[in-house]
Structures are given as C-alpha cells and as structure tokens.
Amino acid sequence: MTTQLSVNVNKIAVLRNSRGGTDPDVLQAARTCIAAGAHGITVHPRPDQRHIRAGDVLALSALTREHAVEFNIEGNPFAPPRAGYPGLLELCRATRPEQITLVPDGDGQLTSDHGFDFAQDTTQLAELIAAFKAVGSRVSLFVDAGNPDIAGAAALGADRVELYTGPYAHAHASGQTDTALALFADAGRRASAAGLGINAGHDLSQANLGDFLAAVPGVLEVSIGHALIGEALYQGLEATVRAYVDILRGSQVGA
C-alpha cells in the first residue's frame, strides 16, 4: 500500500488573507492538488482565523466529497468558540470529515510544535475524542516521537497518531539523521503494537520524505503544506504534488 498524501492548504489562505479578497483561491489550489494525485486535503482552522476560515472548511468539505478524496481537519479541541470561529467540534459536525487530527496548540503559537502530554490531558481528552468519533470521523492525535506513552492514545480512543516530524526535519537538514530516525522508527513500532495507525507531518519535504519513509515502517499518511507550497513557487503546484506522489509510490507501507 502507498502512503497517502494529504496536502495542507493553509499557506494558500495565508497569502490570500495578507491582501484581502479571494486570491489566491484556496478551492482552486485544492482542485489542482487533487487533479495532480493528492489523496486528500488538510486544513487547520485556528480561532484567530489567520489562514483557513470557517467558510473555507465548508467549501473544501464539499469539494473533497465531490472528488472522493479524504478531508482532514486539524485543530485544538480545547479552544473555545469565538466570533467567526464556531469551535472545532461544531466545524466537524457540520462537515463530517474522514479524519480529525487533534493538536494541542495555543492561540499564540506560530505553528504546531509539540504533541499531547497524555499524563496531563487524559480525562478531558478522552471525552473529546468520543465526541469527535460520534461525528463519524477517524480521530488522530498529534504526538512527539519521544512520548513514552504513545500507546496511551489508543487507551483514550484514538484511531491513529500523527508523529510530529519537525525534529526529524531539523536533524535531516543538519546531516545528522541516524538518531532521529531511530527515535521515529521506535515510535512507529510502539504505535503499531498498540493498534494505532501512523500518520506523520510537519516540515516534511521532497528532500527528507523518502529517507523518513524508508526508516519508519507503516506510515499511512503524510500531511504536507509549508514545504510543498514553498517548493511550488519554483516548480509549480501541479508538478510539486506529482513529485511527492512519486516519492510515496517509491516507498511502500511496510516495505
């Protein structure tokens, strides 16, 4: 089985919002990604609406259903609703995405940079996971590879974990990947042993994705946005998505 590519289109919305109006068009970008072979689309609507907004979520939900690809909504389940942001659970109830990825990021964070601490978040998180699964969606939890209790995600009711790959990307850029890859491979094995599916994301790129998949068995999905959109500035969006799909086809799950 080939690892699936879900393209995160947040950065398209960042560029649109920086000027106002509707250009570049998030929906058109998503269509291009799907036509080029992306298996899904990811968004991370934040309460401050810095990029993806509630209206985008609704429109992208319809688009992904039309094209029979998966829709993955990321977000902080603890963030309360506010003006323009109905809350993650309400957005998911309105769209029923194939996957909901829960991420413990605060309002002031530039980007997601750590996973859940199951020692602190358990009771409320278990209740929230049950509520999200009642929507009919698969639930994935954002976790650090070094988390000693990755299996705890299964006990809380999650279906998958998404390994936060930022530390691996930094290690790869510095030419020191062995220790990082060993850590992620171990995390993958522990997740699989607990019956959890494995996703991965954050700072994955054409330069480092192949090495990661070769070392970490069983990755079902990668969510890639920042690097992909940056590369697309030089290579074109369609060509960039096709390049990622080619990398994934060369790295079979479980190989």
Swiss-Prot record:
It comes from Xanthomonas oryzae pv. oryzae (strain KACC10331 / KXO85). The keyword Cytoplasm applies. It is found in: Cytoplasm. Belongs to the PNP synthase family. Homooctamer; tetramer of dimers. Its EC number is 2.6.99.2. This is Pyridoxine 5'-phosphate synthase. InterPro entries: Aldolase_TIM (IPR013785), PyrdxlP_synth_PdxJ (IPR004569), Pyridoxine-5'_phos_synth (IPR036130). The record marks 162 as: Transition state stabilizer. Pathway: Cofactor biosynthesis; pyridoxine 5'-phosphate biosynthesis; pyridoxine 5'-phosphate from D-erythrose 4-phosphate: step 5/5. One of its GO terms (biological process) is pyridoxine biosynthetic process. One of its GO terms (molecular function) is pyridoxine 5'-phosphate synthase activity.
